[in-house]
């Protein structure tokens, strides 16, 4: 593995990136809440934390993942989808004394109703119904999808055994992981509208249930007349079991700064509210604006091979990004390393990363993040090599389908490979545009 380092760089935490906590923790010390994590919602940078990687019982904040996967599958089509309540949705909760909306076996429920019931009423039967929906079968299939998403996000301290959060020894997460789960969920179509709704929701009678059901959010921080009200909190999810105690995760915004804050194992309900105020007051007084830092502060050349022969080199660089820095810190307090393999083999996923390290000292959490680096010059390299024959690429490891197609070269010329790569790059850009459109659609 090659390493290239620069003293001036940027910090970026993407979904799936790995964070390594620094030695010194910035931020308030909480006595009545076991763990917390304050994160920049835009970049994923951890701003302050306490025991953020400790594995704890999440209770109903589990439903952030459940709702996120349901929104991802629906792609904004909430009104035309109806779900049928199964026997397991209802009777698997028998004896748990858990929150529910009295769904009945065989009841036909619009997806939109199941979403708001799960978010606002914290309905465990609603969460079961959604798990069957995005899992494509049983509740267990939904739980498997939840854990698959955890793996895709690269989260090391989370495992789910149910979609609702009833405490179980094999059901746990951490404040850092939960903040990242919410950050991912906020990118799914419609999730932010769901997560931030304050108005009462009305569920009309169904084919079996003649009663109209009403859901209202119960977070006192978001109730204007409450002594615990905080203007900056836009959306939230609460959790409680005897084992987990009180958990809380929220999205907050003030003067253009968007934060995610997760707390776990608050001893009392009042601790949950008071500690959240302490954390947000600290965060918004410390981090007031973003600093835009350019990319390309460190670059390196990476050898490219395909069909058993060397094709040349491409350029790898770190991306540019905006980040929140505490007063007294600047880009000079951040370093970047590029991690590269000895060569990039066509047909395999390019394993190129930028590792950014912030030395926050006493002012800010010291962290490192590992993200995908940018590769440029691949198409140009192949164009320059037109006419060179590639031998059968027996040494190519399977990667993503797009890159695998780029590496298939038996009996082909590099000219054909150029066309393939260019087509795939257009396809990739279209996918990115669709993802961007979905991201902006949430507002």
Question: Each predicted region: which residue ranges?
Answer:
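Structural motif marking the loop-to-transmembrane transition
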Residues: 1-5, 58, 111, 399-407
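Sec-dependent N-terminal signal peptides of Gram-positive bacterial secreted proteins and lipoproteins
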Residues: 3-25, 406-425
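Hydrophobic alpha-helical membrane-insertion segments
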Residues: 11-12, 49, 72, 248
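Residues in and immediately flanking transmembrane alpha helices
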Residues: 15-16, 76, 206, 291
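Active-site-adjacent loops and short helices of periplasmic peptidoglycan-processing enzymes
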Residues: 22-176, 180-189
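Catalytic-site microenvironment of enzymes
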Residues: 47, 431-432
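Domain-terminus/edge residues, biased toward the C-terminal soluble/receptor-binding domains
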Residues: 155-156, 169-172, 176-413, 421, ...
């Amino acid at each position: 593995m090659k390493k290239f380092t620069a003293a001036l760089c940027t910090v970026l935490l993407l979904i799936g990136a790995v964070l390594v906590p620094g030695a010194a923790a910035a931020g308030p010390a909480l006595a009545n809440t076991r763990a917390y994590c304050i994160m920049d919602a835009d970049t994923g940078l951890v701003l302050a934390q306490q025991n953020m990687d400790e594995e704890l019982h999440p209770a109903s904040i589990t439903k952030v993942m459940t709702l996120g996967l349901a929104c991802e599958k629906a792609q904004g089509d909430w009104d035309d989808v109806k779900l049928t309540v199964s026997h397991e949705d209802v009777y698997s909760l028998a004896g748990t004394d858990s929150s529910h909306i009295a769904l009945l076996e065989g009841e036909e429920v619009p997806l939109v109703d199941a979403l708001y019931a799960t978010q606002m009423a914290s309905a465990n039967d609603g969460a079961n119904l959604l798990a069957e929906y995005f899992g494509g079968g049983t509740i267990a299939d939904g739980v498997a999808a939840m854990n698959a998403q955890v793996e895709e996000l690269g989260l090391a301290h989370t495992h789910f055994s149910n979609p609702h959060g009833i405490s179980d020894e094999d059901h746990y997460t951490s404040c850092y992981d939960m903040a990242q789960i919410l950050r991912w969920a906020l990118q799914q179509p419609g999730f932010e509208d769901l997560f931030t709704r304050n108005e009462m929701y009305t569920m009309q009678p169904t084919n079996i249930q003649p009663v109209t059901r009403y859901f209202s959010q119960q977070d006192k921080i978001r109730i204007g007349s409450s002594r615990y009200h905080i203007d900056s909190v836009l959306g939230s999810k609460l959790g409680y079991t005897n084992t987990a105690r009180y958990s809380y995760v929220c999205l907050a915004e003030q003067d253009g700064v968007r934060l995610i804050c997760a707390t776990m194992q608050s001893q009392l309900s009042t601790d949950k509210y008071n500690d959240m105020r302490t954390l947000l007051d600290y965060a918004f007084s410390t981090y007031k604006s973003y600093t835009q830092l350019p990319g390309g502060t460190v670059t390196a050349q990476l050898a490219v091979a395909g069909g058993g022969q060397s094709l040349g080199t491409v350029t790898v660089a770190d991306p540019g990004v905006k980040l929140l820095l505490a007063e007294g810190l600047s880009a000079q307090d951040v370093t970047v390393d590029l991690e590269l393999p000895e060569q990039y083999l066509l047909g395999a996923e390019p394993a190129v990363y930028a590792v950014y390290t912030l030395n926050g000292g006493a002012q800010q959490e010291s962290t490192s993040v590992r993200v995908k680096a940018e590769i440029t010059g691949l198409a140009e390299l192949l164009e320059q090599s037109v006419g060179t024959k590639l031998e059968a690429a027996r040494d190519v490891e399977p990667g993503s389908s797009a890159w695998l197609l780029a590496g298939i070269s038996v009996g082909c010329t590099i000219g054909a490979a150029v066309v393939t790569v260019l087509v795939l790059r257009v396809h990739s850009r279209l996918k990115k545009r669709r993802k961007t459109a979905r991201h902006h659609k949430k507002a």
